[in-house]
Amino acid sequence: MENYSSNCYGFMHAGLLNSEDEFYLSRDEAFEWINGIKALDKKLNKIQWNTSDTIADCLSENNENKYNIIEIFDWDKKSQHVAFLDYDWNFYDQDGPDWPIRLWENIEDLLHEYKNMLWWTAYYQIHILNKDLSTKVENFLDEL
């Protein structure tokens, strides 16, 4: 799957389906069928490790599944990016077509990237996946 071409929402959608198909989707298209996922909704803290600690607390409280989703928003709460997030603080994503798939990178790197890009005004959500979806994501990522 080296040539996998998708945006971040399409990559997430493919993972939730455990599909080898490539998708280029809007945020609404990617999320429309997974209603009911619980979410933690917070503002990115200017002190990055405070955000990391909050995410770690959320993951430790919801550690029954290996994978969840982190979604990052701009000041207007418009979604900017999604990535899979495991309980070891690693994220897995694809930014856009022909961009490399990032696997097993530390969430601190993603937070730093978006904190700088969105000038300290971004929000984030943690979407907690159910066991079935988490397993599909695990199988999808194992095949990459």
Describe the predicted segments one by one.
Residues 1-50:
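Cysteine-nucleophile protease catalytic domains, especially the papain-like/related folds used
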Residues 52-84:
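Active-site-adjacent substructure of cysteine-protease-like catalytic cores
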Residues 102-144:
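Noncatalytic regulatory segments and standalone regulatory/sensor domains
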Residues 71-74, 82-107:
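Catalytic Cys-His active-site segments of thiol-dependent hydrolases/isopeptidases
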Residues 15, 33, 43, 58, ...:
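Residues that form generic nucleotide/phosphate-binding pockets
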